[in-house]
Amino acid sequence: MKILLNKGGGNIENPGVISLWLGNFKSKEVLQKYVEIQFDEQGDRIPSQFMRDFQIDFINYNEDLLEITFIDISTTSLQLLLEGASYYEKIISQFIDYYGEHMLESYNTVIRVYDFEYNEANAVENKHLVYAGAVIYEEWEE
């Protein structure tokens, strides 16, 4: 299998696909705050900083399908970064096939959004995260 690179159109809800970001944060608390969705006085959702940074809206994004990992010591090892992820066995081989067992840089943070295919054309320069791609974790019959 290969990394899906959505280069056209917008971000899309895509059952069976996981989009992955790698990065570095000071602490798990800072990471949690970065992905946390707030509510205004009327109860309307306010996009998280993560959503704003990567131009993700609520139409195709379900925050219940987001997983984060923070490890204390940065690593280049994809196995260590993805350890404990849902569907680990399905996704690790695809990312290793694409990147190799080690990334070129060290990271301590992983953000995974399931059933969501990020449009790489929306990728922006970000001091905390890089978009690593999307892979299929579960086949769906139409």
What are the language-model segments listed below?
Residues 43-142:
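Low-complexity intrinsically disordered segments
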Residues 2-40:
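Short, extreme N-terminal segment that most often corresponds to the first beta-strand
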